[in-house]
Each structure stands twice: as structure tokens, then as C-alpha cells.
């Protein structure tokens, strides 16, 4: 039995959700979920528990990250989705590179999943959080 998209993303009972840039091809899977589509003043105030952001190139990703990263909680579940190489979407993002703004901001990639036949996602966590969890 395959895992649902929520199980893959380890989405549990987080309250302040951000899903930004959600493609229409998988939008239906999120239809029963209540989430913000961009960083709102309310999310800035409460901070983000769970974020899934979609980007097709590094410039777009870096713009999104400037808004999202300062508003994440210490232990937020934070995913960045990007097109697979086989998706036929022109992209400069891949799982091996393109993450300089995240790694420079103290984040590291800890997991990769496939959302569908077009999109993969990397989960990032703050480096010190990982040290606490595994230390």
C-alpha cells in the first residue's frame, strides 16, 4: 500500500500551515486541508508549523525563502518541492545543488520524497535541531 501525500510529508496536527505555489496537478490532494497560500501577517505573528513551498527555479526559490525562513518555528516541518529531471519542466533545481540560501541559513536536507510523477520534495531542518534530536 502506498503512503498518502500527507503521510509522506509527515503532516500530523500542525496548526499554522503554509503551502505556497501549489501546482494545479496535485491541488486536489490538499482540498480538505486548511492552509495559507503565502506568508500572511497572521502567520508572521504565530510562526509557521509546517511549510511546503513549490519552486521551478533557484531565483523563484530564493524569493520564497526570504519570506518563509524568518517565519518558521524552531521545529517546523519544512519542505521544498522542485520538478523532477524527468518532468519536462525547465528548471535549475535538483537534489544535489540549489540550496545555498538554506544551507547558508543554518538548514540541512534530511529527507527526500516523491510527491507525484512531476514533483520531488526535500525536507530541511535547522542544523542545531538535528543535533539536539540525534545528540
Positions of PLM-derived features:
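Conserved Class I S-adenosyl-L-methionine
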Residues: 92-111
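Short, glycine-rich nucleotide/cofactor-binding loops
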Residues: 51-61
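Short acidic low-complexity segments
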Residues: 37-48
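Conserved acidic residues
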Residues: 15, 48-49
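Class I S-adenosyl-L-methionine
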Residues: 106-135
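N-terminal, charge-rich interaction modules
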Residues: 1-32
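Beta-hairpin (beta-strand-turn-beta-strand) motif
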Residues: 56, 83-85, 115, 127
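Mid-chain, well-packed structural core segment of small domains
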Residues: 61-93
